[in-house]
């Protein structure tokens, strides 16, 4: 087994990142989606299949209904998830899973039954020789070269703040909100409606997601930016739709991600903001470790990729933290792959060899072995 490269798969709500241990970046990055034809005749004659996965589903989205098997970080549809894993191994990476140890990632607070089901599918359906299931935020911390810190991980389906001390997460202080990339896309569609642009179908929502990812940024001072947007056209940017029409996006560019900082004010949602989530998680920890956490706030995940988000989070946390503490927010440029890179690094360590759940372990103990071996 030692001579077979480990496969590292980070299953996000929105995007699968997969590749090989020891490499710097994932080889395969594709949407965690399955598309099925809205009506059968729509695809007749076009090498029609009954379903499409990942990029292919994305390309044909106009005639498909799009399904996401992972919702808010948790796998909800196991049959579809199995298809995504199958696609990951055989199509994207072109490997035989029974020849490679596999590291899978999971959301913090993942239900125990889910961890067991993942384990069962890997050993029984894919016959992997060895498996490890790692918490996403812990891997992000490793990829930042730290073992202590608090990770603010915002993906497509869920946002978590996870305090970690000496490599172990502190479960009672983990916080989560169901406010992440997908919600920002929906909110962006709402803001565009104000301008008379209507996007509703799953295909149109993919256009909105693209607008959000390409044009949005976080304002350091929201009120000042709003005032400026009324007085000038500084923030206006054009976006060309697939049909060639050009639309102009103005203050929606920073109003959209402001939702993360002011969920109630921006969209009437009684949720914690990301600064409250981070601060509260730190306050839940032992007083002796708080300083270390404040000095190592790590941003991770695609929804933290907005320009200006690190500076704004720093400003918000500094306003709440004790004045004697030097708060530090770390936002590495490729943080959307931080989880995957952490998995690649961890599995490359010689000390990791003893961590695997082997096929023998599984045959002897069943799926519950995952709770003992993967802390």
From Swiss-Prot:
Protein name (record): Actin, cytoplasmic
Superkingdom of origin: Eukaryota
GO cellular component: cytoplasm; cytoskeleton
Short name of one Pfam family: Actin
EC number: 3.6.4.-
Upper classification of the organism: Eukaryota, Sar, Alveolata, Ciliophora, Intramacronucleata
Purpose: Actins are highly conserved proteins that are involved in various types of cell motility and are ubiquitously expressed in all eukaryotic cells.
Cross-referenced InterPro entries: Actin (IPR004000), Actin/actin-like_CS (IPR020902), Actin_CS (IPR004001), ATPase_NBD (IPR043129)
Family that this chain belongs to: Belongs to the actin family.
SMART domains in alphabetical order: ACTIN
Chain segments annotated as transmembrane: none
Localization terms from the record: Cytoplasm, Cytoskeleton
UniProt catalytic activity: ATP + H2O = ADP + phosphate + H(+)
Annotated keywords: ATP-binding, Cytoplasm, Cytoskeleton, Hydrolase, Nucleotide-binding
SUPFAM superfamilies: Actin-like ATPase domain
Name of the top EC class for this enzyme: hydrolase
Any one GO MF annotation of this record: hydrolase activity
């Amino acid at each position: 087994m030692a001579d077979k490269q480990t496969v590292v798969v980070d299953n996000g709500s929105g995007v699968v990142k997969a590749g090989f241990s020891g490499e710097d970046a994932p080889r395969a990055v594709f949407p965690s989606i399955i598309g099925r034809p809205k009506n059968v005749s729509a695809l007749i004659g076009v090498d029609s299949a009954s379903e499409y996965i990942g990029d292919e589903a994305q390309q044909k989205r106009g005639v498909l209904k799009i399904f996401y098997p992972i919702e808010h970080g948790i796998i909800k549809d196991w049959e579809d998830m199995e298809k995504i894993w199958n696609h990951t191994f055989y199509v994207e990476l072109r490997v035989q899973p029974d020849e490679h140890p596999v590291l899978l990632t999971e959301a913090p607070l993942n239900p125990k039954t889910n961890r067991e089901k993942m384990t069962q599918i890997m050993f029984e359906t894919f016959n992997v020789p060895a498996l490890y299931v790692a918490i996403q935020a812990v891997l992000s911390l490793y990829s930042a070269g730290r073992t202590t810190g608090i990770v603010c991980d915002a993906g497509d389906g869920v946002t978590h703040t996870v305090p970690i001390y000496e490599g172990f997460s502190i479960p009672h202080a983990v916080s989560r909100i169901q406010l992440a990339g997908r919600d920002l896309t929906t909110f962006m569609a709402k803001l565009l409606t104000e301008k008379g642009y209507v996007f509703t179908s799953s295909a149109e929502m993919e256009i909105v997601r693209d607008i959000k990812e390409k044009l949005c940024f976080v304002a350091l001072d929201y009120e000042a930016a709003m005032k400026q947007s009324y007085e000038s056209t500084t923030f206006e940017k054009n976006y060309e739709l697939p049909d060639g029409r050009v639309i102009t996006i103005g203050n929606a560019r920073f109003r959209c991600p402001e939702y993360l900082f002011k969920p109630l004010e921006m969209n009437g949602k009684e949720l914690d903001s990301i600064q409250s989530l981070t601060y509260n998680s730190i306050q839940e920890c032992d007083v002796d470790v708080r300083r270390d956490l404040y000095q190592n706030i790590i941003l991770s995940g695609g929804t933290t990729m907005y320009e200006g988000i690190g500076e704004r989070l720093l400003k918000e946390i500094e306003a709440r933290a004790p004045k004697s503490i030097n708060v530090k927010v770390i936002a590495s440029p490729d943080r959307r792959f931080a989880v995957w890179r952490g998995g690649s690094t961890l599995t490359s360590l010689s000390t990791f060899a003893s961590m695997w759940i082997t096929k023998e372990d599984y045959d002897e103990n069943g799926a519950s072995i995952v709770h003992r071996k993967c802390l």
